[in-house]
């Protein structure tokens, strides 16, 4: 069976000394160790699945935040992903799914 996503971890927000950008996060993808490896993932979708309380509006109890990998960060295989909405601070260190589509092969 083909897998449709790779695992990753949110490292933190993109930031400088004075400013942090909560809608752009640094993500370390499992098995990616160089800048050349991480260029394969440019343009891929990222989803963060977080648990929320169940309600009539949300019967599953899961909230999914979608983002897109926009650029590499450094030389160790970390990438930057831009999310549609700001990620909550609780997402630091949380696992994410890096979808293997859209394909650019």
UniProtKB/Swiss-Prot annotation:
Entry-linked InterPro entries: Ribosomal_eL33, Ribosomal_eL33_sf, Transl_B-barrel_sf
GO molecular function: structural constituent of ribosome; tRNA binding
Domain of life the protein comes from: Eukaryota
Keywords: Ribonucleoprotein, Ribosomal protein, RNA-binding, tRNA-binding
GO term, biological process aspect, one: translation
Keyword Hydrolase: no
Any Gene Ontology CC annotation: extracellular matrix
One Pfam entry name: Ribosomal_L35Ae
Function: The protein was found to bind to both initiator and elongator tRNAs and consequently was assigned to the P site or P and A site.
Family (UniProt): Belongs to the eukaryotic ribosomal protein eL33 family.
Record protein name field: Large ribosomal subunit protein eL33
Species the sequence originates in: Dictyostelium discoideum (Social amoeba)
Gene coding for it: rpl35a
């Amino acid at each position: 069976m083909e897998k449709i996503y790779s695992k990753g971890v949110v490292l933190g927000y993109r930031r400088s000394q004075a400013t942090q950008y909560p809608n752009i996060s640094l993500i370390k993808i499992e098995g990616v160790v160089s800048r050349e490896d991480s260029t394969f993932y440019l343009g891929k979708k990222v989803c963060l699945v977080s648990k929320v309380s169940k309600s009539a509006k949300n019967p599953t109890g899961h909230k999914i935040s979608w983002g897109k990998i926009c650029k590499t960060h450094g030389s160790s295989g970390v990438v930057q992903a831009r999310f549609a909405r700001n990620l909550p601070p609780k997402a630091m260190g949380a696992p994410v799914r890096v979808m293997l589509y859209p394909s650019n092969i």
